[in-house]
Amino acid sequence: MVVEQSGYVEVMGFKLFYRSFGAGDNTLLCLHGGPGCPHYYLLPLTKLANDNFRVVLYDQLGVGCSEKPEDLTLFNIERGADEVEGVRKALRLGQMNLLGSSYGGALALQYALKYQEHIRKMVIASGLSSVALTVSEMTRLKTQLPKETQEVMKKYESKFAFLHPEYLKAVDEYYHNFLCRLPEWPEDVKRSLNELSVPVYFNQNGPNEFTIIGTWKGWDITARLAEIKVPTLVTVGRYDEVTPKVAETIHRGIPGSVLRVFEKSAHLTMWDEAEEYLHVVKEFLAV
């Protein structure tokens, strides 16, 4: 039976909730996306844990079970990278493997630019290096939806009526095509989405995945990717909202990186093709 622990660590003056599965010095630290989407949807990755390999998940500041300060200026990706380093130190992870999903993939890249000496291997799971490129690709994906759905989106986006029931229904159709393609979404996925931290998400991101008007709308580190020297696996779904073009940009930028496209997956590859995804990550990390 895999050892499981949970608790809080104090990082940069705030309490952060973590969960640890498995044991040993070889660790995979997983960064959730959103920004503001708690760790639950990443739980399939804990199947990699055993007596010699540890998987650690945590909720970022303002998210899930972690402390929720009112100061919105604390929610930014640069501070987030320092927070990752604080978690590594607080849990005494030493040199670690790092996996970032979606926004967490962007956060992993930001972390690597400053702290890559602490990374053994890195997995960028449907992550991004440029918000502008990603928004452009998401806008393109919207044109693949039925015409009536596109018209509904245009109508309410022009009015900034992002909470209108008709608009939310259209967004839900987008998500079932490009976020998770399973006919019935798993409870852990629904829980992460239902418990999304609205202050974090709206402040950094915006009202939804493809309307990014928050503080990180101009974020782009593509030109600096060549500075990253750690072995890196870039994964993406064929139907991913953070598209293969975005993944290919990261792959081309990081010397020696490996790109793997999952042909039946949308954004949540660890759910859409769970068994194959875990196999690929396990092989890369040589767990």
PLM region descriptions:
Residues 1-15:
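N-terminal cap/lid segment of alpha/beta-hydrolase-fold proteins
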Residues 215-265:
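Conserved loop-alpha-helix segment in the C-terminal half of the alpha/beta-hydrolase fold
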Residues 94-137:
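Conserved hydrolase catalytic core segment
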Residues 256-287:
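Catalytic active-site module of serine/aspartate enzymes centered on a nucleophile-bearing elbow/loop
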Residues 14-68:
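Conserved HGGG/HGGXW glycine-rich cap/lid loop of the alpha/beta-hydrolase fold
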Residues 121-162:
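Flexible "cap/lid" loop of the alpha/beta hydrolase fold
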Residues 143, 151-230, 249:
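Alpha/beta-hydrolase
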Residues 57-103:
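Active-site loop/oxyanion-hole signature of alpha/beta-hydrolase fold enzymes
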